[in-house]
């Protein structure tokens, strides 16, 4: 009887080639230009798509195995979290505001990224790039789903979680992340890779999924920690894909350098403006804090970002144009953003508050050059108004930046006492901006940004026609429950009552 000889096991490299490159084919019924119409749209020149390599060499069979294992662990933990009243294990109900912002602003962005990468998997001719983009598309949709599932337990007990999808499309502070992703999705395929692979995955994700998720652990929120670290292993692959695409473009043709540099300048600034939300969550909305926004920026921005640009310098890439202005703004942006959220808290689907004296002592230690000089006096003034029974509320409408769509609340890079406002006239109309970076982005692509959907202008159009009550109904905001000051809110009262029941026999 002949002995069966065991087949030699394929090496990882052979298996990767078999399940990616060998699945591709050359077009015959239509030309490549007809099948991939956008690949030349932006002026990027690619001579050999086979030069692109996936450092992880991940194939679909391995992908399903890894993700299924993570799913089993994830749902086991969040089921245990729900069954054991995990919502009562958090440090303080104020922490819920950070989760509400995350659900309204960040989770829909994950879904938008999923749609974008599905499109990139169709628009890139390279088989390796197609497979990597398709896997990332599934990743991003999974991230959105797991975040929504993890936070759905809080929706059973607390206000403000119920209408995150409406908030994403209609709420004024959610247009900041929405405009970021709409901008990326309406770009060509190569710019999209810079926008998401570099700006969102490298700049934003590092500063969100590491320090903020550690903050969730410090504050007893096992559900958020679980989805954060379940996603983090994917994010490492996503960052690598984005950086690999940057290097691939730069290596293919010298003419690609100025185009890529322009995109890095643009998307660094767009990502930095979006980070204002993350900094505010870290400095003000975590009752038990891990690190300040400044400390996180020093690690993940200055050190990691600096190392990245030193690595890219051999291709001719310099640090982004707005890098110095970003560094000057780090010690101010979270305070300025929180002050804005507090004065407009009648129009937010989460609660805000004046920091306690202990918290201001912490902020003073973390921001020794700025907090006591510029921001403690403002909080002290707001505290006096509240104690007198006349809490400050800004009932006017904020002027929005035409590019990033954030209210123009940030100050000049070299003068923290003066608001930074820029203006450009285009085709007989004036447009306003929060910074030089946003103005430069607009002036480079004015026809794109004059079409921006701005929520403050929308308030005076149909179907709202300037009616604040109609606006609240339109955005699914329940006044007196979802919005306003944390002190005296239903969330504060309910959390205290339920915690009391859980820890006493009374």
Residue map of PLM features:
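Acidic/His metal-coordination segments adjacent to aromatic residues that form catalytic metal sites
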Residues: 81-102, 163-200, 217-219, 264-288
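Inter-helical turn/loop segments and adjacent helix faces that build the functional surface
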Residues: 119-131, 153-158, 184-187, 210-230, ...
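Cys/His-rich microdomains that often coordinate metals
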Residues: 408, 438, 442
């Amino acid at each position: 009887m002949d002995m069966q000889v065991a087949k030699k096991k394929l090496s990882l490299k052979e298996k990767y080639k078999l399940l990616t490159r060998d699945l591709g084919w050359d077009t015959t019924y239509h030309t490549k230009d007809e099948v991939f119409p956008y690949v030349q749209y932006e002026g990027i020149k690619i001579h050999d798509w086979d030069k692109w390599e996936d450092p992880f060499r991940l194939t679909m069979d391995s992908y399903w195995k890894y993700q299924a294992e993570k799913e089993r662990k994830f749902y086991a933990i969040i089921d245990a979290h729900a069954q054991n009243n995990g919502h009562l294990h958090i440090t303080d109900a104020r922490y819920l505001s950070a989760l509400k912002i995350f659900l309204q602003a960040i989770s829909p962005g994950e879904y938008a990224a999923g749609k974008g990468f599905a499109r990139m998997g169709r628009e890139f001719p390279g088989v390796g790039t197609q497979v990597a983009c398709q896997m990332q598309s599934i990743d991003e949709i999974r991230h959105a789903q797991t975040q929504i599932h993890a936070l759905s337990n809080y929706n059973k007990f607390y206000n403000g979680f119920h209408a995150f999808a409406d908030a994403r499309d209609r709420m004024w502070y959610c247009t900041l992340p929405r405009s970021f992703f709409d901008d990326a999705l309406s770009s060509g395929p190569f710019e999209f890779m810079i926008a998401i692979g570099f700006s969102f995955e490298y700049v934003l994700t590092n500063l969100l999924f590491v320090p903020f998720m550690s903050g969730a652990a410090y504050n007893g929120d096992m559900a958020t920690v679980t989805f954060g670290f379940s996603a983090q292993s994917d994010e490492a692959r996503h960052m690598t894909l984005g950086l690999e695409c940057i290097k691939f473009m730069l290596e293919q043709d010298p003419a690609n350098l100025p185009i890529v540099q322009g995109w890095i300048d643009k998307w660094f600034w767009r990502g930095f403006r979006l980070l204002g939300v993350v900094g505010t969550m870290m400095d003000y909305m975590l009752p038990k804090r891990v690190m300040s926004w400044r400390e996180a920026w020093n690690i993940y921005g200055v050190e990691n970002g600096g190392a990245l640009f030193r690595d890219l310098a051999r291709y001719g890439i310099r640090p982004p144009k707005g890098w110095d202005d970003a560094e000057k703004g780090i010690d101010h942006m979270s305070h300025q953003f929180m002050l804005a959220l507090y004065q407009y808290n009648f129009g937010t689907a989460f609660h805000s508050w004046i920091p306690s004296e202990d918290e201001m002592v912490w902020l003073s230690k973390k921001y020794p050059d700025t907090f006591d000089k510029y921001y403690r006096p403002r909080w002290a003034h707001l505290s006096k108004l509240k104690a007198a029974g006349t809490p400050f509320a800004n009932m006017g409408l904020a002027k929005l930046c035409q590019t990033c769509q954030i209210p123009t609340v940030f100050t000049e890079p070299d003068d923290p006492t003066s608001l930074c406002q820029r203006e450009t006239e285009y085709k007989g109309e004036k447009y306003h901006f929060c910074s030089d970076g946003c103005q430069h982005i607009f002036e480079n692509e004015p026809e794109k940004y004059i079409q921006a959907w701005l929520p403050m202008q929308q308030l005076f159009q149909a179907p709202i026609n300037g009616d604040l009550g109609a606006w609240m109904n339109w955005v699914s905001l329940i006044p007196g429950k979802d919005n306003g000051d944390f002190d005296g809110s239903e969330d504060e009262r309910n959390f205290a009552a339920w915690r009391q029941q859980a820890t006493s026999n009374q």
